[in-house]
Curated annotation (Swiss-Prot):
Keyword Transferase: no
Gene: trpB
SUPFAM superfamilies assigned: Tryptophan synthase beta subunit-like PLP-dependent enzymes
A GO MF term: tryptophan synthase activity
Complexes and interactors: Tetramer of two alpha and two beta chains.
Protein name per UniProt: Tryptophan synthase beta chain
Keyword entries, A-Z: Amino-acid biosynthesis, Aromatic amino acid biosynthesis, Lyase, Pyridoxal phosphate, Tryptophan biosynthesis
Protein purpose: The beta subunit is responsible for the synthesis of L-tryptophan from indole and L-serine.
Record-listed N6-(pyridoxal phosphate)lysine modification sites: K92
Entry EC no(s): 4.2.1.20
Annotated source species: Leptospira borgpetersenii serovar Hardjo-bovis (strain JB197)
Class in the EC hierarchy, top level: lyase
GO CC, one annotated term: cytoplasm
NCBIfam families per record: trpB
Names of required cofactors: pyridoxal 5'-phosphate
Amino acid sequence: MGKVRHSPKEGYFGEFGGRYSPEILHDALAELETTYKKLKKNKHFKKELEYYRKNYIGRPSPLTYAERLTKVWDGARIWLKREDLNHTGAHKINNTIGQVLIAKAMGKTRIIAETGAGQHGVATATVGAMFQMETVVYMGEEDLRRQELNAIRMRMMGAKVVGVSSGTATLKDATSEAMRDWALNVSNTHYIVGSSIGPHPFPTIVRDFQSVIGIESRKQFKKVNGKLPNAVIACVGGGSNSIGMFYGFLRDKKVKLFGVEAGGYSTEPGHHSATIQFGRTGFLHGTKTLVIQDEFGQIVPAHSVSAGLDYPGVGPEHAYFHKSGRVTYVNVDDDGALDAFLEICQIEGIIPALETAHAFRFAKDLAKSMGKKEDILICLSGRGDKDVAEVARLRKGEFS
């Protein structure tokens, strides 16, 4: 296993990362990096961030022992980090609260975002309303169909939701449109990137704001159990909830870390979003990382039943963790995720996001291979209210 580097050198994680962006964005990215470095050391910023985490998001989020799952799966004990209980229903608010404070410090009056499952869009609309900033969210037309509820929530909070019909009309295309908007309106606009992707310093900023998940989890788990979990599992699309969860345990070599990508409906190109398994080193949205691409280096469309995992790349720090061997990456197919979604609903009375359902499906197999005195901690990245209509459509109303 290679040495894990927590602080990137000039925006790199090993060979991955960097800043590959249009010249028009260079000054904005430099301003963002400089401002963030200053704010990280600023006592008032830290105090303000902590205030909103506690009094607006509702942190710390609970650690829940999944007693029924543990009994039914008949293996390792199952624990859940409940990011679904945050305000807005997912981990995304951890990042948007932090970034809107950066935007305010830079004097920006307008914020924009991309979104897939809609949770980052909702979280951005939320902070836009709270800080009275003009808010625009880009969302693929296919995702607007799948996640109509979240689109309505964004509009109710005053955000303008722009449907993107180019390409596959999903997260990659929404991200591209948001980048174009930022390039055209860089003087008054901050782009709140939603995942641990994009040009430096975005992967580091997003990781830092999401690291509260793992830091809290480690402290909570040790307090309850007097030890650390044997395994930590989180779903991976771009990778923000997982990078945040893993961050708390990176130095604990005895804790195995597992990232679960979307296996789609086959291993054929265009049928999955399993970037770690099938991707090659390339460039996407301003960063050097692993990308699903064809023999000519063209981006191959991604697919997942889950809009939040439907992305043909992965955050550069995840690419680094894969290459270093610190994190093991696997994938779960659409049917497996749908089965797990319903199983968690019916066994624990929790409706999980389809993204997290991928992690649950892998956890089931892992738990059965472990001892009953061992522990698995799962990042429940968000609630699945947004997914119930799509699951009902795909399962034709049959939930048994």
